[in-house]
Amino acid sequence: MRSRFSGAVTSADLLHHVTEVCRHPDFSELRFSILDFRDAKDAVNDEDLLEVRAQIIGAQVTNPHILVAALTTDPGVIEHLTRFIRLGALNRQIQVFSTPELAMDWIAEQSMFRLH
């Protein structure tokens, strides 16, 4: 699944994405989600990230193997995402990339690693 964000990204925007992914009929089998922040100018503040983290932790019970690739080149968005990653919600299952191609290469590599 993929979501594209633009402008100032709010916790409501991210929670909407997480909710949509979790409601997907095949959520337990989904292998990746792409968050495209390339058109975003600002990201969620730290307090709101904790709310998103709580939702993600709950979703991991159903699908502990889902990978999340975030796309951005904006230094501010990268900073916010880096802090979110440090919260440990996805156990190294989230990475930030500058292009969709790099993200898909990582997803393919991680998927192959899990099969062996």
Positions of PLM-derived features:
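Amphipathic, Lys/Arg-enriched alpha-helical "gate/interface" segment within cytosolic domains
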Residues: M1-H116
